[in-house]
Amino acid sequence: MKKEMRQNLIKALLFVLLVYSIGSRLLEIFGYKDMGGGGGWYRFYREEGNDADVYIVGSSHAHCTIDHGVLWEEYGIAGFTLSAGSQKLDASYHFVQEILRLKHPKVIIVEVLNAAGDGLDNKDEDVYRNSLGMKWSGNLWKYVCHLAENMEKDRVWRNGIFAKIPIIHSRYAELTEEDFRDSMPYMRGYRGSFMIERFDRPPAENNREAMALHPDKIEMLEGMVDAARAEGVPLVFFAAPYYLSEEEQMKFNAVEEFARENDVPFLNFNHMYDEVGLDFAVDFRDVSHVNNSGAGKVTRYMAEFLEESYGLPDRRGEEGYELWDKNARYLYNKEIAHDLKISEDVNEYLRKLPELWEGKTVILSLTGNYGALA
C-alpha cells in the first residue's frame, strides 16, 4: 500500500513538473515582449552566472540616454537597462524590487522622469509593457494588486493579469519568428538614434525653485530607497537631459531635495548642460531625448561618476561577459552602417570603406549599373 502511494506521489510530482515545464515554455513563447525599449524582461531572466554590475530602470529616458556600448568599450562597465516606454515610478519601484529579488548588483540607477509628471494614473499600455513579462512571484502579485487598485479594476481583472490571460488570449494570432528565437540575445538595453533636431537651450535650465511632489511619488521613491538599503545595494537617481518646462525642473529640484535628505546621489543633467558638454544644435533626436552624440556625453559623465563613487570592476576580457562584447560590436556596426548610408555618392561610399574597416576584408555585392564604378 505504501509502495503504491509512493509511486502515485512520484507520478503526481512528475506530472506537475511536466505541466510546469510546458507552461513555462509556452509563456516564454507567448510572452508580451514589447516593453517600448530596454533589454527586456526575458533577457534579464536569462542572465546566468555573470550578471550586470549596474542595472538601470526607468522610462525611454533610461534606454535612450545610457549607451552600453560606451559603458563597456571605454570603461568595462557591465550594465543592463530594464526599462519601459513612459514608465511610471510605481513600475520603477517594482522593477527595483525584482532586481533585488534575483540579483545583487554593485549599483542600481533609477531614471526619474515620471517624478516631474502628475500622479500615477496607469493605462492599459502600462500594464502590458511593465507587468506581463515579469515572472510569477510575490513581487508581481503585489504589483498587479497595486495596478488593480490604481486603475479601479475588479478582482477578475487583477487575477487575469496575474495569470497572464492577455498573453494567452490573443498572442497566438501575432506570433513571429522573434517569439521562438531571440535574434538579439546580446541587447543590453540602449536604443540610440542618429537623428538630429536643433533646439534652443530651455529657459528652465537655471530654475532652482522646488515644487512639491505628489505624495504617491514620494512613497515610491522612499520604497526604492528602503528596499535597496535593506539589501546593501547603492541607489542613484538621475534625470536625463531634454527640453523641459519650468514646472518639470521644479519637480526635479524637489527630487534633489528628497535625494539629499536620504543620502542618495541625484544627477539632474538638466542643470549640467555645460558640465557635460551638451549642444542643443547636435545632441538631441527630438524634444524629449538625446541622440547618440548626446547619449555618449551623458554616459561618459555617468561612467566616471560610477567609477569614482563605487569602484566598479572592469569586466572586459572576463569569461562570461561575451554578450557585452557582442552588444558593443552591434552598436559599432550600426555606426558604420549609418556613416556609409549618408554618403553623398558611390565614390564617397568607396572612399570610406578602407577607413571604417581597416585591416578587414570587404566584400561588395553589386546589382544594377556596374559601370557606375568604372
Question: What is the predicted role of each segment?
Answer:
Residues V57-S60, L82-G85, E111-L113, F238-Y242, ...:
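Active-site-proximal beta-strand/loop segments in catalytic clefts of secreted hydrolases
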Residues I336-A374:
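Short acidic-hydrophobic catalytic motif
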Residues S86-D90, L213-K217, Y243-M250:
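Acidic-and-aromatic substrate-binding clefts and catalytic sites of carbohydrate-active enzymes
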Residues I29-N50:
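Alpha-helical transmembrane signal-anchor/signal-peptide segments
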Residues Q7-E28:
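Hydrophobic membrane-insertion alpha-helices, especially the h-region
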Residues E125-V233, R315-A337:
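Secreted/periplasmic serine-hydrolase-like ester/acetyl group-modifying domain
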Residues Q249-W324:
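C-terminal regions of proteins
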Residues V57, H61-H146:
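Membrane-embedded segments
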